[in-house]
């Protein structure tokens, strides 16, 4: 899947500034602003007293994106995409860039790398309004990165790249296609599998075992930028089904890795010390609406459980007191290794949700952890 775009209607018209003195120029606005000398602002404590490294932290804080929780923009708490830190659209306040040329010189490039790039690889009904479609957003990102390259800028590293994915779309290669966009260099990638995004999880039979195929990992590993030092996988389910996610998490930490053979490899902590567990409660209205024969949820709230497994360098894991699985290291040392899927039940569930079972590799069933076991 190629997200690069090319005009089919001839050359595009240039964008010109409406500001006096900046009109009728094909030179990008930031280049024109930076080409002129700026006042040193020595009368301002921001420049005369505060060290540059401290000033950079202040600017980073001011230009980081945030939830715009003004009343008209808040998402309905009863929809599937409402969740902590995603209650409203995110925005960046850029007023700081318009204060003076000296500040602009130090900050003009910050809004893009500081903004968390969020992409939704799932059903359109489970995506916040205004988020756009997957292909369209990917093309926009490709255009922005292409413009940065054309301007001769050095590699721009994005702080955070967050993907919400349905496991079926994930297994079809949409994430690897997204990461293949030229010029994309995220420092941290977060992949969130919501409780509604599991392939083989049926609203009529929510206790059906979960299944997480692994064929997508090799393609993603080929596309990960050398700038990526963390790859987080967030596995979400309902609180009373958390044992299933814990079992899948144990399998992932012991067997999976990200990275190219001969290059930097990102592992997970098999001891569980570096894993994170979070919980939140949300409306049961959306859940009840899609449940017919299964017993209805009691009350107005449902409790959700999220297990976060972070893949990072072996050195980073050891510094945190964690342990890298010897199995994962052996797997990473084998250039022909194929990742083993995580299966909590009969693979025949795929006959309903995906390719025929004869197309799937043999997948071992995973035992559920005992109640006394710590992940």
Describe each region flagged by the PLM.
Residues 1-160, 296, 304-375:
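Short, surface-exposed structural microsegments at secondary-structure boundaries
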């Amino acid at each position: 899947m190629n997200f690069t775009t090319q005009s089919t209607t001839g050359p595009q018209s240039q964008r010109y500034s409406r500001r006096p003195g900046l009109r009728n120029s094909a030179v990008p606005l930031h280049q024109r602003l930076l080409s002129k000398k700026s006042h040193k602002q020595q009368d301002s404590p921001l420049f005369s007293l505060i060290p540059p490294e401290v000033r950079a932290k202040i600017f980073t804080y001011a230009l980081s994106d945030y939830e715009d929780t003004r009343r008209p923009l808040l998402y309905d708490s009863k929809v599937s995409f409402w969740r902590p830190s995603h209650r409203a659209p995110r925005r960046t306040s850029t007023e700081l860039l318009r204060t003076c040329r000296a500040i602009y010189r130090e900050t003009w490039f910050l809004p893009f790398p500081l903004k968390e790039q969020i992409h939704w690889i799932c059903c359109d009904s489970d995506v916040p309004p205004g988020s756009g479609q997957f292909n369209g957003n990917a093309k926009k990102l490709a255009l922005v990165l292409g413009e940065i390259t054309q301007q001769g800028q050095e590699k721009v590293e994005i702080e955070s790249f967050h993907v919400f994915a349905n496991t079926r779309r994930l297994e079809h290669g949409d994430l690897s296609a997204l990461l293949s966009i030229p010029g994309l260099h995220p420092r941290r990638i977060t992949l969130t599998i919501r409780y509604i995004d599991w392939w083989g999880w049926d609203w009529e039979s929510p206790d059906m075992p979960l299944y997480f195929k692994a064929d997508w990992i090799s393609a993603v590993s080929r596309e990960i930028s050398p700038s990526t030092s963390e790859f987080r996988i967030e596995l979400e389910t309902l609180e009373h089904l958390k044992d299933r996610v814990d079992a899948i998490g144990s399998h992932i930490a012991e067997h999976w890795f990200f990275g190219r053979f001969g290059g930097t490899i990102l592992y997970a902590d098999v001891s569980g010390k570096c894993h994170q567990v979070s919980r939140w409660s949300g409306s049961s209205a959306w859940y009840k609406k899609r449940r017919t024969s299964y017993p209805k949820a009691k009350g107005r709230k449902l409790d959700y459980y999220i297990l976060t497994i972070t893949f990072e360098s072996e050195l980073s894991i050891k510094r945190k007191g964690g342990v890298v699985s010897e199995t994962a290291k052996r797997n990473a040392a084998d250039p022909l290794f194929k990742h083993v899927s995580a299966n909590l039940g009969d693979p025949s569930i795929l006959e309903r949700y995906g390719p025929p079972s004869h197309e799937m590799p043999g997948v071992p069933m995973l035992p559920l952890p005992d109640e006394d076991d710590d992940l």
